[in-house]
Swiss-Prot record:
Its main location: cytoplasm. The lineage of its organism: Bacteria, Bacillati, Bacillota, Bacilli, Lactobacillales. Pathway: Cell wall biogenesis; peptidoglycan biosynthesis. This is UDP-N-acetylmuramate--L-alanine ligase. Belongs to the MurCDEF family. It comes from Streptococcus pyogenes serotype M1. One of its GO terms (cellular component) is cytoplasm. It comes from the Bacteria. One of its GO terms (molecular function) is ATP binding.
Length: 442
């Protein structure tokens, strides 16, 4: 008889992906969360997975409880489990045990984890039976799968229970200033993680901090420059994506196309190619399936409303903002790039205020939403979004969900909405405004 898994905080991106994966493997899955809509819940609802409001009544002693990392003892279900000595596992601890049944491929790094995990999952699942867990809330489970691809998160050192066969590390950057004390602390966390990888590491070779990492397993460096073990070259970036070749030890291992934009996506693809080459996967098959990758949720997700191009992206760090704007310019070289950005957490905004301003100056015009504070912090009044606006050189202003009409002051523009909070509310307001304009003009 299959057990019942109950997820406390099932709408979290990792939690929802894991729930979907276990559901597809034949287990009974349910979960609880806040009532506010989150983009992951559509996939859960389509799978028929029950989402309940938090209640002590949801829990029975025979369930296996998996608790999202954001939920602590003040959550009524967590408190109930502790009070009645009902055991539970945190998401990362459960995952660390779960992956032992597979040959596992991890993707770690400050930026690009979800896109790279999605790309690796897409290619591998089209070649052989593969389970995967992606940070956009997408998961696939197969009881017969030999391989497992997953995203490995550094926040609060959550990746320490993981001992994968292979791991990509895309980059190291100072983020999560509410936890990490500085770049050295971040690097030390990644170094500890790297020591747990069993067969091979694939590391971006043009990242000075990453080059300091040491591990017992072989480290293969990838990038654009000579001296790397896997080198992307002969690069052509067009409005249809990116074409490039990859060589290893002086030998060409393939010519590749990815229907994705920005230099960062060429690097992500090169990391995937390097990993699969070392794992013994046929490069011709890899090239075939790279061509058909359609992206992951909330990573350069495009739609057209009333002939207006809107891009939705999870970018919430200066490095990610620069990469997203670069991708938009590659695909739409003749259009004005209008950035609509919502800072995520007060601690990150304070720590990276100057960097955010520099990154947003890559756009042609900038609109800012109010700072989205996380559940882990309190607004002490130390920073306001207007402080960021004052540092931006390009035309900029603050908008509200109720009034996004200033965005209409642009012709021939692409609107890039970026953030990890509720920036999608601003996007939906703009979409409604565009739709109403269409109705009024008919």
């Amino acid at each position: 008889m299959s057990k019942t898994y109950h997820f406390i905080g099932i709408k979290g991106s990792g939690m929802s992906a894991l729930a979907l994966m276990l559901h597809q493997m034949g287990h009974k899955v349910q979960g609880s969360d806040v009532e506010k809509y989150y983009f992951t819940q559509r996939g859960l609802e389509q799978a028929g997975i029950t989402i309940l409001p938090f209640s002590e009544d949801n829990i029975t002693p025979d369930m296996e409880l998996i608790v999202g990392n954001a939920f602590r003892e003040n959550n009524k279900e967590v408190a109930y489990a502790l009070r009645h000595q009902i055991p539970f596992k945190r998401y990362h601890d459960f995952l660390g045990d779960f992956m032992k049944s597979f040959i596992s491929f991890a993707v770690a790094g400050a930026h690009g984890k979800t896109s790279t995990t999605g790309l690796l999952s897409h290619v591998l699942k089209n070649i052989t039976d593969t389970s995967y867990l992606i940070g956009d809330g997408t998961g696939r489970g197969s009881a017969n799968a030999q391989y497992f691809v997953f995203e490995s998160d550094e926040y609060e050192r959550h990746f320490m229970p993981y001992h994968p066969e292979y791991s990509i590390i895309t980059n190291i950057d100072f983020d999560h200033p509410d936890y990490f004390t500085g770049i050295a602390d971040v690097r030390n966390a990644f170094n500890d993680y790297a020591k747990q990888v069993k067969k091979a590491l694939f590391v971006y070779g043009e990242d000075d901090e990453l080059k300091k990492i040491e591990a017992p397993a072989p480290i293969y460096y990838y990038g654009f420059e000579e001296g790397n073990d896997f080198i992307a070259y002969d690069i052509t970036r067009t409005t249809n994506g990116s074409d490039f070749k990859v060589k290893h030890q002086g030998e060409v291992i393939g010519q590749f196309h990815v229907p994705a934009y920005g230099k960062h996506n060429i690097l992500n693809a090169t990391a995937v190619i390097a990993n699969l080459f070392v794992a013994g996967i046929d490069m011709a098959l890899v090239a075939d399936h790279l061509k058909t990758f359609s992206g992951v949720k909330r990573r350069f997700t495009e739609k057209i409303i009333n002939d207006t191009i809107i891009i939705d992206d999870f970018a919430h760090h200066p490095t990610e903002i620069v990469a997203t704007i670069d991708a938009a310019r590659q695909k739409y070289p003749s259009k004005e790039i209008v950035a609509i950005f919502q800072p995520h957490t007060f601690t990150r905004t304070i720590a990276l205020l100057e960097d955010f301003a520099c990154a947003l100056n890559e756009a042609d015009s900038v609109y800012l939403a109010q700072i989205y504070g996380s559940a882990r912090e309190v607004d002490k009044g130390e920073v306001k979004v207007e402080d960021l606006a004052a540092k931006i050189i390009k035309p900029s202003q603050v908008v509200t969900v109720e009034n996004v009409s200033p965005l209409l002051d642009h012709d021939n523009a692409v609107y890039v909405f970026m953030g990890a909070g509720d920036i999608q509310l601003y996007e939906h307001s703009f979409e409604e405004l565009l739709a109403n304009l269409t109705k009024n003009n008919q």
